[in-house]
Amino acid sequence: MASKNRGEKSQKLVSLSRRLSLYKPPPHLNNSARRQHGIPKSANPKRAAVLICIFEGNDGELRVILTKRSSQLSSHSVALPGGKREEGDVDDVETALREAKEEIGLDPSLVDVVTVIEPYMTRFHVTVVPVIGILFDKKAFNPTPDASEVESVFDVPPEMFLKNENRREVEDEWMGDKFLCHFFDYQSGEKSYMIWAFTAAILIRVATIFYQRPPAFLERRPTFWNGIPDKDLGKL
């Protein structure tokens, strides 16, 4: 996808952008996995998209933007900017960018979208597509969160999701499929955040792609997310 932003750019981000533009997502939820988890082959699940927006921090480290959902919402955990696809959205990229604009005031023109990765199917049959974009000019972004949806906006180093630090896990099960739910603790100033479950899983996958190495712990993801076994993810 062509770059929309001009001027001097971080070479680290340029290199990452070029590499990610070549990424080809593997096949997602296969028919056998659908049948195993009670999802009809002809099902047309609801669709959503999230934005993995990457920028370079002051120390030269990659950072990804996250939000703490408003306490007014039924789910007020940490999440990536994003939401459900609307009728007027042309594609998943537009959904992710529109939602990021609405939720945190991120101007779509600031984001260079480079790729999408394999979709995830939630247990509620919602297909979630992670869209990866580069924010070359971090100074041009002044977060203006929608108070009805977002309590705060913060950023973390994606590499933390490959490390066995400030992490714990709990075994969960759904329809006979046992898997691990991962919890990552992060401190930003005086605020503490817990990144877990679905959001953590997406960020583990993103970090694996970015740094081209597996996490330092057993991931054991649920099969129903996208039908790709852990042993095969390591080959991608």
List the predicted regions and their residue ranges.
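N-terminal leader/linker segments that precede catalytic domains of diphosphate-processing enzymes
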Residues: 1-80, 84-142, 159, 174-236
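Acidic, glycine-rich loop-and-strand cores that form catalytic or ligand-binding grooves
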Residues: 138-167
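Non-catalytic RNA-recognition surface used by pseudouridine synthases
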Residues: 169, 173
